[in-house]
Amino acid sequence: MKRTSSLFSQIVDYENLRLAWLKARKGKNSKKSVQNFSRNVNKNLQVIHDRMIASPPVLSKYIQFKIYDPKERMISVVPFPDRVMHHAIMNVLEPVFERQFIFHTYACRKGKGTHAAARYAFKCAGRSEFFLKLDVRKYFDSIDHTVLKQFLCRIIKDARCLEL
């Protein structure tokens, strides 16, 4: 497995941050936080840049709230500036991770997703009238961060990038 370096400078590059802002606001232009950020976009992108290059990087706390759809769930979201950071990171890391995935990995990938996964599952299952719908309880909360970080270290050797 080839390890990738010198990613941090690409992530914090101003043009990448601007692209990240455009992606993060897509479909959310009516939100007050997006409008406020966009009013002073250059200044706010500089603040994000400064937060990212600080060691350790300055991150905001998650905002949590409950929804009932159809059962009670706790939702965690980050403030809009951190969302821009996430997009900046993924703009650079997505191609790195795409090379690691097997073809039939469907979640959160361009041109894939739940509909493509369902089509493939139906194709494999033939004409079966039965299916299994499941929800892994507290899946993201149960991910072992030590194991995840070890996996990331095998792919990424840029220490500054790993701090993010």
Predicted regions and their residues:
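Non-catalytic, polymerase-adjacent accessory regions of viral genome-replication enzymes
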Residues: 1-46
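Generic recognition of stable, solvent-exposed alpha-helical segments in well-folded globular domains
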Residues: 2, 12, 43, 83-84, ...
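Reverse-transcriptase-like RNA-dependent polymerase core
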Residues: 16, 48-71, 84, 91, ...
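Short, conserved non-catalytic motifs in the polymerase core
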Residues: 27-36, 60-87, 100-112, 132-133
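Conserved polymerase palm-domain catalytic core
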Residues: 44, 51-52, 70, 103-104, ...
